[in-house]
């Protein structure tokens, strides 16, 4: 379903157009109302898309982003409100347990490139930033908006560069700039099953001393095929647990990774879990 404000505003403009065209006094002109409604709705969507494209030219990705852009956050949330309901129906559980005060590290399995959109839709008030592979910065529009939302880019082939990204995440949390979302598997695997974790990512929570929000996603891997068929995908997002700092105090990152892996694996079921090693340092 499209956002209410978009539907209502289109209805108001269509009613005004119908009134000016005399549709309410002449029944033969009632066709003006639905045509005006659809036309105005499309014009708003096209105009908004054009604005997003034009504004992206003002974004300099070479300039360090020291804080979250409220304006870009607002635009991103509007895009998510507009696009996500058109392509997926989200069935979410546990959203009431998301921390309301303070920052957190959110971890989840990773199935498709649009996984972040699910969390933006489910937790619009949580001010999320996403750890992403550096190649995504080159994506049309998305790369520039990621920069404004302080999304740390990680080089998965260079351990030293990856460490810098981890330290950046820790600083974002400590400075209370945003909550961080990371996918511990590091990759989207072809079989779409849960694979081993890169346990170093849990250093982010340990060093920043923040809760770890454990989530799972299901069915986002079908989005691409269903979009082509103009079919909505039923996506399942489950918040399994919120692990407080005192609960993981004294644990190594491997132990913590194994605990979270087990939690996700049990929820997803054996058919969605790889049989390989659980976590790697």
Segments the model singles out, each with a brief description of its role:
Residues 92, 106, 130, 237-239:
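Generic preference for hydrophobic
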Residues 85-87, 125, 146-148, 175, ...:
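Short, well-ordered coil/turn elements that cap or connect secondary structure elements
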Residues 1-104:
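Membrane-anchoring hydrophobic helices of lipid-metabolizing enzymes
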């Amino acid at each position: 379903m499209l956002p209410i404000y978009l539907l209502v505003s289109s209805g108001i403009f269509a009613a005004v157009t119908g009134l000016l065209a005399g549709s309410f006094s002449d029944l033969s002109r009632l066709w003006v109302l639905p045509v005006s409604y659809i036309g105005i709705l499309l014009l708003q969507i096209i105009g908004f898309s054009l604005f997003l494209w034009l504004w992206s030219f003002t974004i300099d990705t070479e300039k360090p982003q020291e804080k979250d852009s409220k304006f870009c956050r607002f635009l991103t949330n509007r895009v998510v409100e507009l696009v996500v309901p058109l392509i997926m129906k989200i069935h979410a559980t546990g959203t009431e347990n998301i921390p309301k005060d303070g920052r957190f590290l959110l971890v989840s399995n990773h199935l498709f490139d649009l996984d972040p959109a699910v969390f933006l839709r489910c937790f619009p008030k949580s001010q999320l930033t996403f750890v992403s592979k550096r190649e995504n910065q080159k994506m049309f529009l998305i790369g520039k908006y990621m920069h404004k939302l302080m999304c740390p880019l990680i080089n998965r082939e260079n351990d030293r560069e990856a460490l810098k990204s981890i330290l950046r995440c820790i600083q974002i949390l400590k400075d209370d700039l945003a909550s961080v979302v990371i996918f511990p598997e590091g990759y989207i695997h072809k079989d779409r099953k849960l694979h081993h974790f890169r346990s170093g990512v849990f250093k982010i929570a340990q060093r920043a001393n923040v809760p770890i929000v454990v989530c799972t996603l299901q069915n986002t891997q079908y989005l691409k095929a269903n979009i082509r068929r103009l079919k909505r995908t039923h996506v399942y997002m489950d918040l399994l647990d919120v692990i407080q700092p005192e609960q993981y105090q004294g644990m190594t990152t491997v132990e913590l990774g194994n605990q979270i892996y087990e939690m996700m694996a049990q929820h997803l079921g054996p058919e969605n879990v790889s049989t390989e090693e659980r976590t790697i340092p």
